[in-house]
């Protein structure tokens, strides 16, 4: 690898005072082009602004590997005056790999501190992302609960219930593929806002559509899935812009914790709300929560921290220093043929397929499993089904925090992703095999809880791995893999029913799912990488 040498010189100001900037991006960087000189020995190009030899003044530091530099530019908002004195502050970071970047950030020259709130801006961001993911899943579960009174009111057959439930995935499988590309192009803020507005509208219209015709109901449910399919790839694009590499798994864990918590809240709250305000009122209530979130999101979040007017300079520098090397200006999105030619990409695809396969088997059939195998009533089945999802919401955060701790401790990104993914697949596989020995619903609930809790470690495995190998195209590639995974979810959900009908038992299909978990673990550990593949 080429050696990269960075030289920084600083012309100190007579006095350092806060500065107001016309450009949010420039102001956040807080850099003065005059007096800055950066040169890299691995490149024939150099950046120089103003006089003075930076190398003589500041000395040089070198390292090896892939390097990246972060320097403020453009705009005339560089200057501030107080008492006739001019301040100059220069910050330059040039490194080779993530550790080099972080060390470079620690050596940044003094930058005037902007007033900032006590709560980091990225904490607000991840809280809002977790909130919208909670609503995303909660709105799905509303229909799963409401479908029972709907069926009683309109005389739906069991087969039609299956069609209604699957109609959500018809739109989902399409938008999950294109949603990431939209987020990459237009920014996560706009795309997530549009998606939440649309799925909240579809939620509100569902009772009305059911009263009109079956075609109208299926169309509204497909529209609902179309809007929700954007959420995951948009999150995959949005979070890497706001969090350095060593914090991303934690951010994903918190966001996914919100997603799984939405399952629990809606499962338990929907029957209560429905008993007070009816079917239409329940859907309207959850839709209103979406628009309430939207009003907060639009005025408090930007797609990129460089566009934020409230972020502190120190936090911005931390984020920029911890970003993966960005793509060369002017490079094009890789073709589908190029994407599918990379075995590292197939490792992520296979992991996504198997994860979705197992996830939707448990999501769709767990209440039926408890009722059929252990002959419990529907209320008991709902509680036994809710417990695993509640624990999963917490375990996802533990998985993310553990992964980030290992990366900060010096373990390679590839090794950490493989460890997390192994836990996320081997744990559920063993738990599903043990279900054949469960004699009581309580023991089965414990095994289901273990399976789902450990499966959440996949969030710090293959899910974050997309951001490692293609940070610039994370949304698009996650959309592609998630779209393929959604097809697997449709197959597994329908396949479970046929297996139970033919064999009279859930265990055969659960055993097949366990075998897929184990096989995917071997494939992922063999071919996955933490290196940049698409830049």
From Swiss-Prot:
Family matches, as Gene3D superfamilies: MFS general substrate transporter like domains
TM stretches of this protein: 125-145, 160-180, 191-211, 215-235, 254-274, 279-299, 343-363, 381-401, 413-433, 443-463, 483-503, 504-524
A single GO BP: monoatomic ion transport
Superkingdom: Eukaryota
The UniProt record lists the keyword Isomerase: no
GO MF terms, alphabetically ordered: phosphate transmembrane transporter activity
Record's keyword terms, sorted: Chloroplast, Ion transport, Membrane, Plastid, Transit peptide, Transmembrane, Transmembrane helix, Transport
InterPro entries the UniProt entry points to: MFS, MFS_dom, MFS_Na/Anion_cotransporter, MFS_trans_sf, SLC17A9-like
UniProt keyword Transmembrane, yes or no: yes
Pfam families membership: MFS_1
Membrane topology: Multi-pass membrane protein
Location(s), subcellular: Plastid, Chloroplast membrane
Cellular-component GO terms for this entry: chloroplast membrane; plastid
Presequence boundaries: 1-95
Family: Belongs to the major facilitator superfamily. Sodium/anion cotransporter (TC 2.A.1.14) family.
Function description: Probable anion transporter.
PANTHER family noted in UniProt: FI19708P1-RELATED (PTHR11662:SF399), SOLUTE CARRIER FAMILY 17 (PTHR11662)
Protein name: Probable anion transporter 2, chloroplastic
Organism (species): Oryza sativa subsp. japonica
Recorded name of the encoding gene: PHT4;2
